[in-house]
Amino acid sequence: MVDVWLPYGKTEVCARIPTRNFLGSIEPKERLGVTDSRGEIERALSEPMGTRRLNEIAKEGDKVAIVVDDATRATPSDLMVSPLLDELNRAGVKDEDVTIIFGCGSHRAVKPDEMEKLVGEEALKKAKTISHDYKSGDQVFLGKTSFGTKVYVNKVFAEANVKVLTGDIGLHYYAGYGGGRKSVLPAVSSAETIQHNHACLLYTSDAADE
């Protein structure tokens, strides 16, 4: 018998395979990460793809909303937010005009002791922070999607002159991939919007075309 140990949550489980049935295992090729994470983020901000630099988009007097992931995601937001604030400062945006929104979607609000871990002490001192409340009645209607979803989003986010989405792109057990546009829906959207959008999972292709 061959014992094959498989990661399972925070532990491992053993699969015992008869030797005659075991052909071998294919291991992923290990890739080392960057050694200077902040430097890479600063480089990305100075060399954006398909758009102008953030400090050319934002200007003095603008209200800026930065959406970051909540405590249920292992996104290194603390590495991203500080360089973003520096880039906005170079554009003339004052710290008091920046709001960091924890994109909680339908999750609970971020606890005070979690905020520093998520975005870092420096960012907490410089910018305002709020947790999105999907049950709040103070949301702004933006319109309908092609699937008929009424889109209501966080008022602070909607009224910001400049909106910055942060996060990671990763595999998702329902949607295939998660990240990117999820920083708007569901992250800063209303209960009605989230529920209707998630229900689209059950649509057939015919229903989606109607």
Where are the regions a protein language model picked out?
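Short glycine-rich or small-residue beta-strand-to-loop segments that form or flank ligand, phosphate
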Residues: 63-74, 99-105
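N-terminal amphipathic/basic leader segments beginning at the initiator methionine
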Residues: 1-41
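Conserved small/polar residues in nucleotide/adenosyl-binding loops
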Residues: 203-208
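Glycine-rich phosphate/diphosphate-binding loops that line cofactor/substrate pockets in enzymes
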Residues: 49-65, 92-95
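Histidine-anchored nucleotide/phosphate-binding helix
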Residues: 74-93
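A short, gly/pro- and small-residue-rich
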Residues: 173-193
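An acidic, phosphate/nucleotide-engaging active-site surface
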Residues: 110-178
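Short helix/loop capping segments that flank catalytic or ligand/cofactor-binding pockets
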Residues: 15, 24-26, 75-76, 165-166, ...
